[in-house]
Curated annotation (Swiss-Prot):
Protein name: UPF0763 protein CFF8240_1572
Family: Belongs to the UPF0763 family.
Family annotation (Pfam families): DUF2603
InterPro entries the UniProt entry points to: UPF0763
Origin species: Campylobacter fetus subsp. fetus (strain 82-40)
Amino acid sequence: MNNERLDNISNSLGISKRKRTLFELEQISDNEMKLIIKNGKLNLSVPWFGMSGNTPCTLVPAGLFEAIINTLKNAQKENFELKLEKSIWQHIPVDFGDVWSVAIDEIKKSKFKKEPNLDRVVKKIKKEHPNLFVDMQSLIQSKEN
């Protein structure tokens, strides 16, 4: 068993060697495998670590898996929102909330296959709705006059 890699994974999750359940998967037939617990207890509330041939693998309880996925989704959403916020502020909005709403509507109505280029989205909004942004050129010209 490639215990070093499994040690690193479980240690990064805060699961000590003592509390870790190790298993091995053994191929019995084309559609059947045998799970052998090598170390630890039958505890279905924590991840198990094991090997299937030379491949390290884990078994994760469904509730924990769902929590991990939700955490990743929330982190992705927060990251997206921070990028959008930064892009909006770079274009000097008159009212941040108005631009945010228009940007969210624009993103929802456009069917992007991957994450949209937020700078392009905000530039498009600025072009279509210039009243939502401070016109720096007219400010500079009024100062010069």
